[in-house]
Amino acid sequence: MRLKNILLAIIFCFSINSYGQQFDLVILGGNPGGIMAAIEAARMGKTSLILERNSHIGGLPANGLGATDIATRGATTGLFSEFTRRVKDYYIRKYGIDSQQVKDCSDGFHFEPSVAEMIFKEMLGEQKNKITVLTQRQFNFSDGDLQMKGTKIIGIRVVNRTTGGYEYYSGKIFIDATYEGDLGAAAHVPYRIGREARWEFNEPGAGRTYEYWKSEPAEGSTGDADNAVQAYNYRLCLTSEPSLRANIKKPENYHREEFVSLIEDVLTGRNTWKYMRDVTSEMMEANRKAILNGGKSTLPGDSWGIQKLVTINTLPNGKTDANNQHGAFISTDLPEENWPWPTSSWEWRDKFAKRLKDY
């Protein structure tokens, strides 16, 4: 009987500890939203665990999106305002207040990816007694990866991508800071993917729409609902500084036919801007002759040089945040190929990520 009681006690201990150390907050995703949630919680005396799938934290700002997308900087407050201030202070300390780097950081809204990651780590490090960050932890959003009590998440299982083993964590509150919404989906939170129909909420710009960039909907636009999601790309940190350059190798699976149409795009000047509605075939042929004679494109809306392919935003130290060129037929996006991403496995996502990188 005594042995039986001991065994029961051991089993009971395993069951209550099966989801490991408990935190006030368990945050899935080391993106800016997750990082800032942990920092604010720490300043309120709460403990947090951040589980990040990749080896780097910081999400988009630490991976190429160095030119902050914000139309009204006056609306910047809170922890993001603190982040931009720290960015600017870093460039002032390192290069001097009158340096080109400080000018190019645009009051802290433009930054090199490595600087963004450094600032995030600095802010997290100030709360190291309250915040635990674990990288290379993958949540597979499958049955058994969440422990639920009714509709409340109380535990999570992740894969340690370094060891291949499972790890279990519990928390009072769980935050989904992934770009995909994987935690919410796994917890059966209702969601929808794609564009709603024009008439569902009486939105004239909703649904399936075709148009030139910055134009009005063109013929063929139905306004119907579909499963389309915004195209994805890599924000390219390029440079004009020879000493900072890294060679870009030709991918093994490079397919020339995917880019052949770019030759005609360059010669004729054709693009996706609204001005193309008024461009004639005669104008494009005249543009072709001018370029073949050593001139530059004069077609309305056309870009020249590398900006034919990407939109260049200046960052400090001669670097760039190169985004998709919305005015081009071929750029860094792969529209429609990415549509399965939100609900696909990590195996599919990794394959698409490589496909996009190679492209």
Per-range role (PLM):
Residues 16-20:
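Sec/Tat signal peptide C-region and signal peptidase I cleavage site
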Residues 5-15:
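Sec-dependent N-terminal signal peptides
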Residues 21-31:
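Beta1/beta-strand and adjacent pyrophosphate-binding region of the FAD-binding site
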Residues 136-139, 144-155, 162-173, 177-359:
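Flavin (FAD/FMN)-binding glycine-rich loop and adjacent Rossmann-like elements that form
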Residues 34:
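N-terminal Rossmann-fold NAD(P) dinucleotide-binding loop
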